[in-house]
Amino acid sequence: MSYDYLIVGAGFFGAICAYELNKIGKKVIVIDSRDHVGGNCYTENRDNINLHVYGPHIFHTSNEEVWKWINQFATFNNFVYTPVANYKEKLYALPFNMWTFYQMWGATSEIEVKEIIEKQSSVITGEPKNLEEQAIKLVGHDVYNTLIKGYTEKQWRKSAKELPKEIIKRLPVRYTFDNNYFNDKYQGIPVGGYTKIFEKLLEGIEVRLNTDYFTAELPEHIKVIYTGPIDKYFGYKHGKLEYKTVELDHMKINTSNYQGVAVINHTDKDVPHTRTIEHKHFEKSDSPVSWVSWETPVEYIPEKTEPYYPVNDAKNTEIYNKYKADALLEDKVIFGGRLGEYKYYDMHQVIASALECAKQLTYLNTWHPNL
């Protein structure tokens, strides 16, 4: 059988390109090394609860085009992301807002909060030299020590004094009693989970799971849309790109309500995990049991652990730019998505990127990879 496109990866970028190309009659084959579609957005129903297998995914966007497009494939509920921080068994509202400051200092006005932060941040004189100094200068030492230091050091597996200040360019502080984590116009969780979206996108398209692009026998001499790690594609010839990664331990709990909220951030460094996720709260499941996940940062080992978050520091950006230059020379391959572009994408951003790619290939009838 002949194909027009081989798409490597059944996450959002690959699945959207497949859908749009298939819609205009192109013959497409999609492969994925995992045993399921959906990439890191994959959800799995357990006890009438849709488990976010690779960690919580809350859809949010202010992009009207993206919102309208994704609603073809799912009905979204009215879930609003309001995580809570746990530090030494005391709870604080997130993101930093007047509830947080009331819980921390008893402050009830913007003036009080600004005075406290200004006094605490004044200990940093001159230009901050590292992440710790940058954070203290922005929000003071109480907020830093309680809600930032331990969580950040667990995420990066390094002391905050060793981390570059550029990681925290700014810290959003709200002087209102508003716990909504996102500022976007639209927000929610697809009713029935994310996997159903991918099943609809890939309906009628040949999909091969458990298929490794580098070892499987695949159609040759056709155009490729590659959404895997770009450094792996080029045989790591410029070095391996770094990622932050986590392990998730999923556990069934025989209670109808374990923690009362979808996500709790654990900011105490002595607690090894960074988050606990109670999945039933995403869709308000009435299941008599609950599924809870413990998320713990681990060392990233290429091809052994899952790459989650690109480490876009100067060193890794320099390596990526070499791969990007190589990608520009590939006349039949386009690199897309978080791994293919070594870029942190929220879901709405990767959807917009994939739609633009598909538009270029579909309606403009041109092929300009990697521009």
Residue ranges: model-predicted function:
Residues 85-222, 227, 232-234:
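Active-site/ligand-binding neighborhood in enzyme catalytic cores
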Residues 19, 23, 43, 203, ...:
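Short, well-ordered alpha-helices that flank and scaffold nucleotide-derived cofactor binding pockets
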Residues 12-13, 35-36, 99, 153-154, ...:
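Short, solvent-exposed loop/turn segments at secondary-structure junctions
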Residues 43-69:
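N-terminal glycine-rich dinucleotide-binding loop that anchors FAD/FMN and/or NAD(P) in oxidoreductases
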